[in-house]
């Protein structure tokens, strides 16, 4: 009675820490794709300023906080999820978005939830090599594979590869540079052989390689090739995008390829399972898609799946469980659970509460005699909040980048690997002309006080990709004011207003550039947001020495 009273009052004295997880049973093993994408408040700002209803029940939380992670673990395992497949980034030794894993290994309840990596190798051409494969495998062995928390199958640590073709391309190119010819697929096989040898020398029985299946139709030759290369299983990412083609009967007359209802996803998922079940060459895990609405990232270029509800998601879960029972499938994967910016999220949030997690539990798990574990929020037991402090906003419109990014953050579909190195702000260009590279909310300043935007920077094309056919590269600056905000109604971007540009050189040398703003009719009012694109050359590396308004 005393504990119940304290619980009702939300007294922290009753629960000094996150209540211990209560496991639920299922005859199907459930993995969830986890994207550790919010290492700073600026990433949450993207959601807060566009789709605030997506706010997690943990708040705009510090994703590396072990206590917050213990809540994630508790909620996952109490709803049948037993492992996370975590996006893991490595680019020639450069690692990023490690904050969640570092916090996980300090979390009290980490023993309840295994993890393994989805090697997110969507890097620039030339990033993979024999030397790099040795280095990355060494890192895996020394830091992850021998820890009890790392997920294994038959004693083999599991590794999912995001883009095998990137790996294959670079190993084929490396061989060609030495006068050797490799056929498509042999590069992957060579890379895997390096890792297999190293893990066996370290006392492990091998690696359980998992493929990221790419096609919407069954392809027996594809499956056979993957097995020959060393893969042992497959999953599929983004099956909801195939809905317009595979389930036209579920599309409404007003639907388009980039805007359609979740009913089409409910209809499509079983068709994908049926397609992949036609072969037993490469075992696949039953995919449970969580939706898509990437307006916070893609704006005008977004794909929006509407009408997603816990009830409709529950229907997919029930069908998935029935499929597993019918065909003896013992592994399902929910993907992803926390892509907040892309609209693929089911972790407990303000919009749906625990509804999406409950749908998984109710479909796959055996209800205990005493009932399901109670869905507890941090505030219920006097814990939290775990929010980041507000994002830094530059007090003056000038940036030197001596030792920090000074409030700038990357556009997810525009810039990658943002960091300060050697006194410069560094990043590389992805999705040119789809988005700007970096952005910042600034302390509002009066446009009339400044006539010029100056930048000293270096643009270096990727050695393999070159200029990508861009003959006259330019840099762009976009600004927002109260009268003309950058993000307009419907999360659309007006590319015609509040933008200026100038030519740049992409030859690996530093130059100073200036954009004349004085004659631009939109350069007025109080500027409160800035977006910057260094150049439209895919994979180019950029180093910004300084920026300033004068």
Regions found by a protein language model. Give the residues of each.
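Boundary at the C-terminal end of the N-terminal hydrophobic targeting segment
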Residues: 8-16
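Hydrophobic residues embedded in beta-strands of well-ordered beta-sheets
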Residues: 157, 418, 423-426, 458
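Short, surface-exposed loop/turn motifs at beta-strand boundaries within globular domains
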Residues: 25, 394, 411, 420, ...
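Extracellular glycan-recognition surfaces and repeat-rich motifs
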Residues: 403-424
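Extracellular ligand-binding interfaces
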Residues: 427-526, 534-549
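Glycan-processing catalytic domains of CAZymes
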Residues: 15-394, 458
